[in-house]
């Protein structure tokens, strides 16, 4: 599986830790690795995440992360295929990091990993499910940052 990272907003260079994001996301997707599958992690600003949220989910607010699963092609065409996209709002991560006692990098990683956990089939519809996703994300991030 290949993890593509795109920075579509102004993010300080010291936070553009592509290798760390790729490693963390691969761990979150460990049960769904497909050789030719690709996942796109797209860091965006508040305006863009609002646009995506309105356009595709009919939600009229800024959020931290949005993930979209893509259907697997019905047969192997021998070419890479998109497993999913994860949109992460950098500005929300920057604002929320102090509240959760994270660095900005940790908060960005939380959102990217959270989105990948959704792609892997986890949900956060209940407080218990959300807590489990947070535990999984924290565990992955701790292992990557050690």
Identify the residue ranges that each predicted region occupies.
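An acidic/histidine-cluster motif and surrounding catalytic segment
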Residues: 1-108, 120-146
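Short active-site segment of divalent metal-dependent hydrolases/proteases
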Residues: 113, 117-121
């Amino acid at each position: 599986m290949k993890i593509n990272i795109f920075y579509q907003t102004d993010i300080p260079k010291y936070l553009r830790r592509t290798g760390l994001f790729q490693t963390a996301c691969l761990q979150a997707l460990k049960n769904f690795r497909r050789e030719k599958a690709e996942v796109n992690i797209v860091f965006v600003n508040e305006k863009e995440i609002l646009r995506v949220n309105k356009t595709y989910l009919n939600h009229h607010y800024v959020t931290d992360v949005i993930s979209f699963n893509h259907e697997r092609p019905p047969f192997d065409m021998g070419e890479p295929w998109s497993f999913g996209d994860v949109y992460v709002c950098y500005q929300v991560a920057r604002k929320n990091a102090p509240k959760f006692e994270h660095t900005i990098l940790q908060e960005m990683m939380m959102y990217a990993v959270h989105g990948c956990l959704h792609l892997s089939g986890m949900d956060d519809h209940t407080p218990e499910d959300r807590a489990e996703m947070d535990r999984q994300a924290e565990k992955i991030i701790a292992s990557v940052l050690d």
